[in-house]
Design a protein with these regions (language model features):
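Intrinsically disordered terminal and processing segments
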Residues: 1-63, 67-128
């Protein structure tokens, strides 16, 4: 019985250490993502067409196709979005189109995915 208790205590300790390690890594990823900056989109410089862009910040990977018509962003299609729990961030494309800017707020609870989507759009339009 004593051996069983020792094993249980060791397992609990390992689970706690694993959880704390995961939390530290997740916090580091979020803090790294929050310091990224975005270029301002000059709609006067946008040429009509469809542009592909990609961005990856662990654990999120995004590919987009951005459509420009009459110098305005008219559509952003998410071709790929490996997101973990960041699916709610996909609505950020509507904000980008509405404001014609990457200077839009991240979706709460999906910060890393929001930033990755904005960076992929930036890549599609500016090649960054």
């Amino acid at each position: 019985m004593k051996t069983l208790k020792k094993i249980a205590v060791i397992l609990i300790i390992l689970v706690v250490i694993g959880f704390l390690g995961f939390k530290l890594v997740a916090n580091k990823i979020i803090s790294d993502a929050k310091v990224l900056t975005f270029e301002e989109i000059d709609s006067g410089q946008l040429k009509d067409g469809e542009y592909l862009g990609n961005y990856e910040i662990f654990p999120v990977k995004v590919s987009v196709k951005t459509t420009v018509l009459n110098g305005k962003i008219t559509q952003i299609e998410l071709l790929e979005h490996f997101n973990g729990k960041g699916a709610p961030a996909e609505k950020i494309v509507d904000d980008i189109i509405e404001k014609q800017s990457l200077q839009v707020d991240a979706v709460s609870g999906a910060t890393v995915s929001s930033i990755a989507i904005k960076k992929a759009v930036e890549d599609s339009l500016l090649g960054k």
